[in-house]
Design a protein with these regions (language model features):
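Domain-core detector
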Residues: 1-150, 162-185
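Catalytic core of tubulin tyrosine ligase-like
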Residues: 157
């Protein structure tokens, strides 16, 4: 790419962490193309970074170990690019709805509905606008603008095209207390 695509993982690591950004971008491409698993790419990235810096410092002052920072960066980058491709696929098909995945142990927030992944997971949303049956994707999940929401920092959720009247949501409600317990482990 001759330097045209950089910081694809959109890490917020500071400018002093350019090596971290470069290594995360390389790991992202290895995972995204199927050349390596998340774990293999993370381990390779950690090994390379271990030669350069022991921890990653973010502009917020937050610090992470290399393993955590690299894996989070790869996961976030893959989720964001997958989300962008799904939105484009929906546009190409003329569809305006998506179904968000769900999992036990989804992030919980009692103060921010966007950061409360447990609250919006497993549901169908409108990409543009909203209708009588489904809420707006951006308003409900923060996608693609809020880094605390869907496909944001360390988010494991994905979403797929959904056509009301044809597609079906087979997600079963997850008990909120069971989810909270799993999240807090």
């Amino acid at each position: 790419t001759a330097g045209e695509i950089s910081n694809i993982t959109r890490t917020t690591a500071g400018a002093t962490n350019q090596a971290f950004i470069d290594i995360c971008d390389a790991a992202y491409w290895k995972v995204r193309t199927g050349a390596q698993s998340y774990t293999a790419a993370m381990l390779e990235g950690v090994k390379a970074l271990g030669q350069l810096q022991p921890i990653v410092r973010y502009p917020s002052g937050h610090k992470d170990t290399l393993e955590v920072a690299v894996l989070r960066s790869i996961r976030t980058g893959v989720a964001q690019s997958s989300g962008n491709m799904t939105i484009q696929q929906c546009k190409d098909m003329g569809w305006n709805h998506v179904l968000v995945s769900q999992h036990l142990g989804a992030r919980v927030s009692d103060t921010d509905p966007i950061a409360d992944h447990a609250g919006w997971q497993g549901k169908v949303y409108c990409i543009d606008g909203k209708d009588a049956q489904f809420d707006n994707l951006l308003d409900a999940t923060g996608y693609p603008e809020n880094p605390l929401g869907l496909c944001g920092y360390n988010c494991c959720h994905s979403f797929t095209p959904f056509l009301p009247g044809v597609s079906q949501n087979h997600n079963k409600p997850i008990d909120t207390e069971a989810n909270r317990r799993a999240y807090e482990l």
